[in-house]
Amino acid sequence: MLILDTNHTQEISRGSPAGVRLLNRLRECGDSVATTIVSAEEHLRGWMAEIRKRTKPEEQVDPYRRLLTTMEFYSAWLVLPWDFEAAALFSLHRTGGVRIGSMDLKIACIALAHEAVVLTRNSVDFSQVPGLRHENWLD
């Protein structure tokens, strides 16, 4: 199984040339592909923050449209949950000294729980998680 990190899902959702190439490669690879509730949270929170920044209702139209588009995007994917197994792995790695961002560590622990490969641009942080397999399919 392949798990898309937030930076990979964002490229696909934007329809960027790199995202289009990634989507084509995913279709051809034959592996099951998922993302995580953590990536969905990060992506959705970004648009919610944009909405909160705008004080005029007409300035909120585009961020709300993008929020809806993002929700629709994630509804088309298998989204893996944050569960007790991932939470236990998170605690184990934190007490074991892994010091990366909480959201990245949550994504890593979901991947470990599913014995999956994380597709990410962030190899610096993800390489600090023992046993985690990760690849960058964008660059």
Predicted regions and their residues:
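Histidine- and aromatic-rich ligand-binding microenvironments
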Residues: 4-5, 100-101, 122
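Short, well-structured N-terminal submotif of metal-dependent ribonuclease cores
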Residues: 1-38, 49-65
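Acidic, PIN/NYN-like endoribonuclease modules and their adjacent C-terminal/linker elements
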Residues: 1, 108, 112-139
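Short, flexible helix/strand-to-coil boundary loops that buttress conserved ligand/catalytic motifs
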Residues: 13-16, 47, 94, 130, ...
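Residues at the C-termini of beta-strands that transition into short coil/loop
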Residues: 37-38, 83, 122, 138
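Alpha-helix capping/helix-boundary segments
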Residues: 8, 39, 86, 107, ...
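Active-site neighborhoods of divalent-metal-dependent phosphate/nucleic-acid chemistry enzymes
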Residues: 45-51, 73-119
